[in-house]
């Protein structure tokens, strides 16, 4: 089973919620935690892992043999990722945009396109207590994460529970959606300012025809705008996690919330039960 955690903004507490659920279930299931917040991997702050494997993901990106290039512009026209630029009658390549498909060279009549290696990112595999932890981190200059995704996908445990912490913001959701999650957990703080991104996430997941539910994190005592919206539009609320000063100020380690008090453990147990209920429908 694959459960993906997504959010519309940074600093919502998505990683905290995902890590706590994985930590709660580590002794009950064979849990693998995937930190797929590829531009800003930070789950190890909560799950300080001992790494046992590290793999560089290398793709082949084009380079131009200028002695052979006749400036036909076939490469510029055929590449949908904008790797090739025509600048003052010279073809410039942007390797950080490349997906490594190799399509461009088949359209070069002069055989002027060769390839060179480019480090797209790294994948680390380790453990923390009973958890398997995988971290996917993209090169800071890279734009396309496809090959990083394919290599991450191969590490999913088909017989266990895979908890995936996705990158915030809609532009990155293709990365986690391509992992084909069984269930999406949308983490929100319930505020009005987040409604635009929240609605866009809901629409994308509905178009994928995947079950999902909403967790309202850092909830205040009064009813939030998004809570009202969910109830009025029959969107399932999985849980409401309260705002507590001790948690926000760091007086308790975030990954130990499920052991911090019986109250927090019960909240996360209820969250897991609600996920199972929604998946089974």
Descriptions of predicted regions:
Residues 21, 25, 48-71, 82-100, ...:
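Ferredoxin-like iron-sulfur electron-transfer modules
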Residues 3, 204-281:
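C-terminal lobe/tail of nucleotide-utilizing enzymes
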Residues 29-44, 117-123:
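Short beta-strand-centered segment that lines the nucleotide-binding/catalytic pocket of NTP-utilizing
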Residues 74-92, 103-119:
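Iron-sulfur cluster-binding cysteine motifs and their immediate structural context
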Residues 36-37, 135-144, 149-174:
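Switch II (G3) loop of P-loop NTPases
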Residues 171-192, 198:
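Inter-motif core of Ras-like GTPase G domains
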Residues 1-26:
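Walker A (P-loop) phosphate-binding motif
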